[in-house]
Amino acid sequence: TAVFSQWPDHNLWNETDRKPLSTYGTMAWQEVEFFYYVQFILDRQMRAAHEYAVARGVVLKGDIPIGVNRNGCDVWHEPHYFDLNSQAGAPPDGFSVNGQNWGFPTYNWQRMIEDGCLWWKRRFQNMSQYFDAYRIDHVLGFFRIWSIPVDCVHALTGQFAPSLGMTRDEIESYGLHFQEDLFTRPFISRWIVNRVFGKHADHVIDKFLIHSHDDIYELKTEYDTERKIEAAFAGKTSDDDIWVRDGLYSLCSNVLFVRDNNDSNKFHPRITAQLNLMYEALYDSDKAKFNALYNDYYYRRNNNFWYSEAMKKLPTLVQATRMLVCAEDLGM
């Protein structure tokens, strides 16, 4: 398996293992040397292509995606630079109502900044051997990244990281009485079950839910995250199964606020909460208060903070090489 966390003897990188694994005659030597050779040949080919282009007045532009594979060598070798309890993605937009979950880990920017972002500098400097310009794919990731809990399939209960979460007092300053359990736990009433599942409502109540009080239900422990639901429906492809699975996903994200990843006493309005059934259940006056809070949070509150965060990283990285920097981004 390529999932290094499952390797019995080498799930954590140990530099002292390098020499024995690369020593002639050892069990792993032949395979290790093969990949050394592949990288050596690729380096020669890339350098030759670059020199050929430059000699003819052609500039080569490379691409640097914001993330790396969760099971890649970067994470294995230097896990302290990454937050393995989250996954990066993008908020919902007109093309993806559930947002995007890219799956790769977010960065531990505080740790990176402590050593002057050496990991990123090495990445850029290595790339400068083959390219004259580069495109940062998702440059907004240097300002803030959409951080999704690892137990999620969709991106709806993510939050921007870093960002300024709201205290209870700040939320209530908009006139909205903050009911923590009601607003942060999936709101599942009988009318919502009927609306979401239709003819499957009774089956869903019997198999996936437990009664809480009045006409309110909760997800059973074995189905209380999107990843658990995904596993339960693995291999099931009928229309009815997909209907129920996607409905259960929607229950998981039927909240008004998500708790801050770093401070349990702070909260973020759930992205596009106005489209969920928890919002529909509010009084019109509370909807107006939530909308005011939501718009301030997503379009004003964090702007200066995000700018200052980017300025801790981007200037030093841009100056790390002579390559021309191009930035790209789409969406929110």
Language model regions located:
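Catalytic cores of glycan-processing enzymes that make or break glycosidic bonds
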Residues: 1-332
